[in-house]
Amino acid sequence: MARVTVQDAVDKIGNRFDLIQIASRRARQLQTGGKDPLVPEENDKYTVIALREIEEGLITKDILDARERQELQEQEAAELAAVSAIAGDHHHHR
């Protein structure tokens, strides 16, 4: 079990409230999104992994926002491709 110093994580993010927001978002990603942790898991809970990632500067609000945007774009692109295939659109303008 890795030791997490919450204060280090707070210092990275700036305040405890934002830290909790970011850590919970990241923990949810790890839990539901099948995302691979950026640090060794060491049998830690998702929340602990999230805090460790933040503490090491691997996860910030900007990084999370950018990742979510990218995922949405990929999702939309995949859906668009699927709809195009079903609609039998053979004229792809990319």
UniProtKB/Swiss-Prot annotation:
Enzyme Commission (EC) number: 2.7.7.6
Reactions this protein catalyses: RNA(n) + a ribonucleoside 5'-triphosphate = RNA(n+1) + diphosphate
Pfam families, per database record: RNA_pol_Rpb6
GO cellular component, one term: DNA-directed RNA polymerase complex
UniProt cross-references to InterPro entries, sorted A to Z: DNA-dir_RNA_pol_omega, Pol_omega/Rpo6/RPB6, RPB6/omega-like_sf
GO molecular function, one term: DNA-directed RNA polymerase activity
Enzymatic class: transferase
Assigned keywords, A-Z: DNA-directed RNA polymerase, Nucleotidyltransferase, Transcription, Transferase
Function noted in UniProt: Promotes RNA polymerase assembly. Latches the N- and C-terminal regions of the beta' subunit thereby facilitating its interaction with the beta and alpha subunits.
Assembly and interaction partners: The RNAP catalytic core consists of 2 alpha, 1 beta, 1 beta' and 1 omega subunit. When a sigma factor is associated with the core the holoenzyme is formed, which can initiate transcription.
Record protein name field: DNA-directed RNA polymerase subunit omega
Organism annotation: Photobacterium profundum (strain SS9)
Lineage: Bacteria, Pseudomonadati, Pseudomonadota, Gammaproteobacteria, Vibrionales
Name of the encoding gene: rpoZ
